[in-house]
Amino acid sequence: YPIDALPDVIRRAAEEVGAFVKAPTVLVASSALGSLSLACQAHVDAKRAEKLQGPTGLFLLTIADSGERKTTCDSFFTSAIRQYQEEQAEAMKITVKEYESENAAWLAEREGLLSAIKEAGKKSKSTEVFKENLKQLEYSKPEPLRIPRLLYVDTTPEALAYNLAKQWPSGGMISSEAGIVFGSHAMGKDSIM
């Protein structure tokens, strides 16, 4: 494996982890590059030519026997990503509670206006004021929170697409066990097409 082709900081990290866990260089380097790619892909594009650039996301498949320390290597390099996710979730706990209460109040107010429109309609009374209030209320709908979630193991294509679109716009399926990825919902016969 051309470990010398890696930038110094990545090469040194891969060599250090490789020496510590006694795993094959290619396995360690793949874990390092995969985690680095995941951390950077939302922020950086790779410029391959003057008018040719694209995402830094990678598709990596490393084949190794059981016991070659795939999980250990991945854990070393994804630990910072996992820690970041946990810290962000913890830091946003109060904000999440505030959002939930604001959203519940907004939903209750919306439900009340819809009920008022329905009742007024049944009694053949004007619904214009309620409709206008409902229209104005729609503009004050609380924005859903975006809490970083970068790592996925077993998820459906629909859930992954939803999470990338609505919760956090970057993520990766990183697993040291191919069966989890290839046997997951995302690789089902209907999804893989």
Predicted regions mapped to residue ranges:
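Phosphate-handling catalytic cores of nucleic-acid transaction enzymes
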Residues: Y1-M193
